[in-house]
């Protein structure tokens, strides 16, 4: 009896976390609780926005768990931010600010390959590059700068010179485009000029001067009038010759119709009389004779060739 009391007073043995029952029930292990307590101060620091994770080496948890904390961030932030293996700090609200790339670009150089995250981000301006450009601009002499700016000005001067030449040439061309003034002659002047032209087609200089003085005209006006009148006279002669040629061609095209004799009741008497009386020459003749078949006279030609 006392032995049984001692056995009942002993507490039951604790179950091992690696037993089959604990594994099947999938209960959270008690060993994880210290890990949660480790992250509790970080949560409070994030809410207060006063703690940064820049000195990651001072923390006790391993570095491999940092990506898990980073993967808890929003997806759109992960796309914009650079690669996660660089050192970063947590700002207010739990977001990690993007690390500046100029230091890395200095180390890698301009031709080094860049990761996919950095290709999307714009390339920062290198301060040394800006200084080199400033030195290059300062190293240029003022004469070179003036020469570079003077090239377009010389081209403008050339263009302006061409425009000036065109303006000078334009007044000379304007009188040629003006309409010529036409002289109006009176009836008496036209009659005197026509009578002189009928007598003489061409005038000498003295005759032209005397005619211009008598008609109160200039010698140039008389000269131009005679030139125009001679051109008109030549056109009239050409028209008359063309009309004569047309009339001659029309006369040659006249169709010659032969004279036909109709037979009547006294055909026999007419045939006999025709044999005795010579046939008069017709008005219209043909090169070939025309024969008419007759029962009495079979070979008597009615029309003779010329």
Curated annotation (Swiss-Prot):
<keyword id="KW-0539">Nucleus</keyword>
<feature type="compositionally biased region" description="Basic and acidic residues">
    <location>
        <begin position="153"/>
        <end position="174"/>
    </location>
</feature>
<keyword id="KW-0524">Neurogenesis</keyword>
<dbReference type="InterPro" id="IPR009057">
    <property type="entry name" value="Homeodomain-like_sf"/>
</dbReference>
<feature type="region of interest" description="Disordered">
    <location>
        <begin position="95"/>
        <end position="181"/>
    </location>
</feature>
<keyword id="KW-0371">Homeobox</keyword>
<protein>
    <recommendedName>
        <fullName>Homeobox protein HMX3</fullName>
    </recommendedName>
</protein>
<keyword id="KW-0238">DNA-binding</keyword>
<dbReference type="InterPro" id="IPR017970">
    <property type="entry name" value="Homeobox_CS"/>
</dbReference>
<feature type="DNA-binding region" description="Homeobox">
    <location>
        <begin position="178"/>
        <end position="237"/>
    </location>
</feature>
<dbReference type="InterPro" id="IPR051300">
    <property type="entry name" value="HMX_Homeobox_TF"/>
</dbReference>
<dbReference type="GO" id="GO:0030154">
    <property type="term" value="P:cell differentiation"/>
</dbReference>
<comment type="similarity">
    <text>Belongs to the HMX homeobox family.</text>
</comment>
<dbReference type="GO" id="GO:0007399">
    <property type="term" value="P:nervous system development"/>
</dbReference>
<keyword id="KW-0217">Developmental protein</keyword>
<keyword id="KW-0804">Transcription</keyword>
<dbReference type="Pfam" id="PF00046">
    <property type="entry name" value="Homeodomain"/>
</dbReference>
<dbReference type="InterPro" id="IPR020479">
    <property type="entry name" value="HD_metazoa"/>
</dbReference>
<dbReference type="InterPro" id="IPR001356">
    <property type="entry name" value="HD"/>
</dbReference>
<keyword id="KW-0221">Differentiation</keyword>
<feature type="compositionally biased region" description="Basic and acidic residues">
    <location>
        <begin position="117"/>
        <end position="143"/>
    </location>
</feature>
<dbReference type="GO" id="GO:0000981">
    <property type="term" value="F:DNA-binding transcription factor activity, RNA polymerase II-specific"/>
</dbReference>
<keyword id="KW-0805">Transcription regulation</keyword>
<comment type="function">
    <text>Transcription factor involved in specification of neuronal cell types and which is required for inner ear and hypothalamus development. Binds to the 5'-CAAGTG-3' core sequence. May act as a stage-specific inhibitor of anf1 in the anterior neural plate during the development.</text>
</comment>
<dbReference type="GO" id="GO:0005634">
    <property type="term" value="C:nucleus"/>
</dbReference>
<dbReference type="GO" id="GO:0003677">
    <property type="term" value="F:DNA binding"/>
</dbReference>
């Amino acid at each position: 009896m006392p032995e049984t009391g001692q056995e009942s007073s002993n507490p039951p043995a604790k179950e091992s976390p690696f037993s089959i029952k604990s594994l099947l029930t999938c209960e959270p292990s008690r060993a994880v609780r210290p890990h949660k307590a480790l992250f509790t101060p970080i949560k409070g620091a994030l809410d207060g926005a006063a703690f940064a994770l820049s000195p990651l080496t001072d923390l006790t948890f391993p570095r491999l768990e940092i990506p898990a904390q980073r993967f808890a961030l929003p997806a759109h932030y992960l796309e914009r931010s650079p690669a996660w293996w660089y050192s970063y700090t947590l700002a207010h609200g739990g977001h990690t600010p993007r690390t500046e790339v100029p230091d890395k670009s200095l180390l890698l150089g301009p031709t080094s390959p860049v990761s996919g995250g950095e290709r999307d981000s714009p390339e920062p301006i290198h301060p040394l590059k800006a200084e080199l450009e400033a030195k290059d601009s300062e190293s240029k002499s003022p004469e070179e700068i003036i020469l570079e700016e003077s090239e377009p000005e010389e081209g403008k001067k050339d263009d302006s010179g061409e425009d000036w030449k065109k303006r000078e040439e334009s007044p000379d061309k304007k009188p040629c485009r003006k309409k010529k003034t036409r002289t109006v002659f009176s009836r008496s002047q036209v009659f005197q000029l026509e009578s002189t032209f009928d007598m003489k087609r061409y005038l000498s200089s003295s005759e032209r001067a005397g005619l211009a003085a008598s008609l109160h005209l200039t010698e140039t006006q008389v000269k131009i009038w005679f030139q125009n009148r001679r051109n008109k006279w030549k056109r009239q002669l050409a028209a008359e010759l063309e009309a004569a040629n047309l009339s001659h061609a029309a006369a040659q095209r006249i169709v010659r119709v032969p004279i036909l004799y109709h037979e009547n009741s006294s055909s026999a008497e007419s045939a006999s009389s025709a044999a005795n009386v010579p046939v008069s020459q017709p008005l219209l003749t043909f090169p070939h004779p025309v024969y008419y078949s007759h029962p009495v006279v079979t070979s008597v030609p009615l029309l003779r060739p010329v």
